From Swiss-Prot:
It comes from Sulfurovum sp. (strain NBC37-1). ATP binds at residues 9-16, 35, 119. It is an enzyme of class 2 (transferase). GO terms for biological process: tRNA wobble position uridine thiolation. This is tRNA-specific 2-thiouridylase MnmA. The keyword Cytoplasm applies.
Amino acid sequence: MTKGKVLVGLSGGVDSTVTAVLLQKEGYEVEGVYMRLHDKPGYHEDNWGKVQKVADYLRIKVHFHDLSEAFNANVYEYFVESYKKGLTPNPCVMCNRTIKFGKMVEFADTLGIEFVATGHYLQCDGNYIYAAEDAGKDQSYFLSEVKKEVLPRLLFPLGTWIKDDVKAYAANIDVLKEFATQAESSEICFVENSYDEVLAKHMNIDMPGETVDTQGNVVGTHKGYMHYTIGKRRGFFVNGAHDPHFVIDIKPESNQIVVGTREKLEENAFEVKQINLFEDLVEFDCEVKVRYRTRAVPCHIKIEGERATVVLTEPVFGLAKEQVAAFYDGRRLLGGGVIC
């Protein structure tokens, strides 16, 4: 008797491949799905071939599911429009909420499949998400906006694995050896080299403008506001500057960037919108990560209406509007919100 049916998101990479192998060994009836999300040249032909190889090895059914229209509406356009507004979006978080753990779950429903799995490095007990054992690969941050209703259906077998062990496991299976040595995929799947190249397909991003200080005085020049994010310290000119200067604000309406020394980036409190919590909380203490690769900082959160105020016990640097703040209680993810 099987543990139930599970739909595994297969990308052609080692993580999703080993995920499918492990779940089958654990007694699940596995089906795979390859999700076509964008039109990156040559991307899908190669990966679909790898997915079919995995399906043949495991003798499982695999589906090719075109979600490019939904991805474009929920992720790609959000990415482009956010940069137009001088914001710094996190497309991976929105993709996880709307596509991988939104549309993929809906697709599982049409197939009569109870569980959904991916090769993400994190853990889930059906009620909460937890950080992975491999701290360097932990991806729990990116699921802070996933709807709590889907948590009981999610499986993440790599949450207790170390990345090197995953590669070694694949290398010991003759048919899957090539998966162990292939290059890691990029963080943002539709970006080939840099986000600038994506934006340049839709608008003119090379618009030289003024660099100003916090008092509004013109102190230099820059190459176009969409080239910058909060905290960036290169790519613009400041007259007579001896200390490093950083972007501390972006003004798209005037094509200006505001710069200052590092202490100007310091923030002790901020607000979030689009609050997503895995339990009913109104006012609570926890830790918050304001970017993926940052340390969690203790804080106090108070929710009022559709927004929450986050007061920090120590300052953070480089808060960027539209980035995601993920809330933790130790390794347990409580949810998150979008910085505003």
